[in-house]
């Protein structure tokens, strides 16, 4: 059904998986997409919608984002990989090895930061539920979001300021951004990858 427009809508792979990667990338960079250029491919002739998508984004703070999502990458098991490159170095994280973050400073050696290890940010410490060396698991990632949202709701009901570390949960605007990105990516792919505005009207 994911590739049937009558059931899935205008996009398959990008709408199913790509928007989650886009949201994570926006959160990590602290920037929102401004424009995008999309290349959609259907590797099976029977599929109307895309099963492989490569989308480039121009972000609000000047960053460049390259997003690839595919359901035909044989041998990759939910291979979510995030890489960030900046003037001070590069970061790399892979979902298949979720407890390690690789940091390579410019002209330096690669360091491995372990989840739950010393010297991490308060946000990272707060999100760790089990001791170092034990897998957190995907459900706990969602539990962190629900716990943060519950803290904000309770704080509002009780008339107090919520814990500032709990204010990083996805909002309705993030959902709107995902829907706008799907429409823009479909339009861009249909125009041979033409750069297309990826902002919701409220951010234009």
Regions inferred by a protein language model and the residue ranges of each:
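Glycine/proline-rich active-site loop of Rossmann-fold NAD(P)-dependent oxidoreductases
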Residues: 31-32, 47-49, 63, 76-80
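Predominantly a Rossmann-like dinucleotide-binding segment in NAD(P)-dependent oxidoreductases
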Residues: 1-47, 101, 192
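C-terminal glycine/acidic-rich active-site capping loop/insertion
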Residues: 2, 54-61, 88-169, 204
């Amino acid at each position: 059904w994911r590739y049937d427009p009558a059931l899935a809508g205008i996009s398959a792979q990008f709408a199913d998986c790509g928007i989650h990667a886009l949201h994570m990338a926006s959160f990590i960079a602290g920037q929102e997409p401004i424009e995008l250029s999309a290349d959609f491919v259907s590797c099976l002739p029977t599929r109307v919608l895309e099963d492989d998508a490569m989308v480039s984004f121009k972000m609000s703070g000047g960053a460049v984002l390259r997003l690839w999502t595919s359901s035909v990458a044989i041998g990759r098991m939910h291979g979510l990989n995030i890489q960030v490159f900046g003037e001070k170095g590069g970061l790399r994280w892979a979902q298949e090895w979720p407890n390690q973050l690789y940091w390579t400073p410019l002209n330096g050696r690669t360091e491995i930061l372990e989840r739950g290890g010393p010297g991490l940010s308060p946000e990272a410490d707060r999100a760790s539920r089990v001791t170092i060396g034990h897998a957190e698991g995907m459900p706990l990632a969602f539990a962190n979001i629900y716990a943060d949202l519950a803290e904000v709701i309770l704080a509002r009901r009780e008339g107090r300021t919520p814990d500032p570390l709990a204010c990083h949960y996805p909002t309705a605007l993030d959902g709107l951004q995902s829907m706008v990105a799907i429409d823009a990516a479909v339009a861009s792919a249909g125009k041979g990858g033409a750069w297309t505005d990826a902002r919701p009207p409220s951010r234009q």
